[in-house]
């Protein structure tokens, strides 16, 4: 399948949700794809323990250096301070290196996250 069509299809699918934020989470130390999956699964469990109704999709991307990963997320129902609190408390990174932007629906989910999926690193959805 053509990557442009694939990205557009993912964007349309993820665009059905009314997201609150687009976030980029950066690690303090290098993390492999496998380790990133473990940390992102823990973040998901943390949200569940907070007993909040939420939706999330995250995509992993390699840093330009190729030695570590970082994650891009779309979230709904999650206060970004909760993300930063978890990230710092778990010693994964500093909140000043995390980036949170209010989701602008008119840009579409493909603008925010679908473009990373075709890099075929790793991704996960919850609640959608």
Please report, for each region that a protein language model flagged, where it lies by residue.
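Right-hand nucleic-acid polymerase module
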Residues: 1-67, 77-128
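Conserved, short, structured surface segments that act as functional micro-motifs
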Residues: 70
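Long, low-complexity, serine/threonine/proline-rich intrinsically disordered regulatory regions
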Residues: 73-74
């Amino acid at each position: 399948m053509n990557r442009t069509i694939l990205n557009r299809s993912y964007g349309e699918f993820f665009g059905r949700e009314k997201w609150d934020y687009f976030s980029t989470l950066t690690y303090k130390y290098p993390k492999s794809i496998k380790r990133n999956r473990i940390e992102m699964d823990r973040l998901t469990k943390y949200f569940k323990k907070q007993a909040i109704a939420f939706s999330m999709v995250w995509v992993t991307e390699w840093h330009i250096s190729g030695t570590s990963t970082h994650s891009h997320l779309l979230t709904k129902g999650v206060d970004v301070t909760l993300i930063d609190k978890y990230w710092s408390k778990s010693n994964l990174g500093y909140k000043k290196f995390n980036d949170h932007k209010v989701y602008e629906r008119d840009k579409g989910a493909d603008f925010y996250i679908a473009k990373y999926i075709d890099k075929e690193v790793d991704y996960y959805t919850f609640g959608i």
